[in-house]
């Protein structure tokens, strides 16, 4: 299913590329275009990721990735079932701006591989690289349930967006991995839908339409 969605997304990007606003490939040297594509993918990812933590229905999709109380490479594959779909509206902006869909796809795979490496406790501080890149240390913070670590370090490849937009937090104390309210189950179906069940239960008990909208689009009531 993931590969089908990836293929459909690539096809959509090629379609949208016909309506690009800027002919970037004719303006920039190819090596600059590649670098800029990596930067823009991470820029879009930062906001997609940040919104996924602050909008309730997107958090219901994303929270399964944070449900593990361990931190290792396997956690990077603990992905939300509907995650690839939720990303589409955000990343479709890139081909519309004029970024080549083929370069987007390749750079996206490389960025994903970097993200996989970030899910580990084996790699410590990487010195000067900590200022620019989202290192394993920074990503451990992102998976922390410690109060000061919640909703921090959203970047995938770079940490510069977090530094710019005020969501950066260094790894100063041991990280307690998982959710504030842990799921206490290994059942993938329960983990995937428990956030949705909470949303619909809250909507069912809402007093008016505005309150129902808040439960769906507002921030998570309890930061799970």
Predicted regions: what they are:
Residues 12, 129, 161, 196-200, ...:
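Generic structural signal of hydrophobic/aromatic residues within well-ordered alpha-helices
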Residues 1-5, 28-180:
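Membrane-embedded catalytic scaffold of the fatty acid hydroxylase/desaturase
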């Amino acid at each position: 299913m993931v590969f089908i969605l990836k293929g459909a997304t690539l096809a959509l990007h090629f379609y949208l590329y016909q309506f690009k606003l800027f002919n970037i490939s004719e303006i920039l040297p190819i090596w600059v275009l590649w670098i800029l594509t990596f930067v823009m993918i991470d820029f879009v990812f930062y906001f997609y990721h940040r919104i996924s933590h602050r909008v309730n229905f997107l958090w219901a999709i994303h929270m399964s990735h944070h449900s593990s109380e361990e931190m290792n490479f396997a956690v990077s594959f603990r992905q939300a079932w509907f995650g690839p779909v939720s990303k589409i509206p955000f990343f479709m902006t890139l081909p519309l701006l004029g970024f080549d869909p083929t370069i987007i796809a390749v750079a996206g795979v490389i960025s994903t591989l970097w993200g996989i490496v970030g899910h580990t406790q084996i790699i410590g501080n990487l010195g000067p690289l900590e200022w620019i890149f989202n290192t394993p240390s920074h990503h451990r913070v992102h998976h922390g349930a410690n109060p000061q670590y919640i909703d921090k370090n959203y970047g995938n490849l770079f940490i510069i967006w977090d530094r710019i937009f005020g969501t950066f937090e260094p790894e100063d104390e041991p990280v307690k991995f998982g959710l504030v309210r842990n799921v206490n189950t290994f059942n993938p179906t329960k983990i995937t839908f428990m956030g949705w069940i909470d949303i619909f239960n809250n909507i069912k008990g809402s007093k008016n339409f505005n309150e129902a909208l808040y439960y769906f689009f507002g921030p998570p009531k309890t930061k799970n």
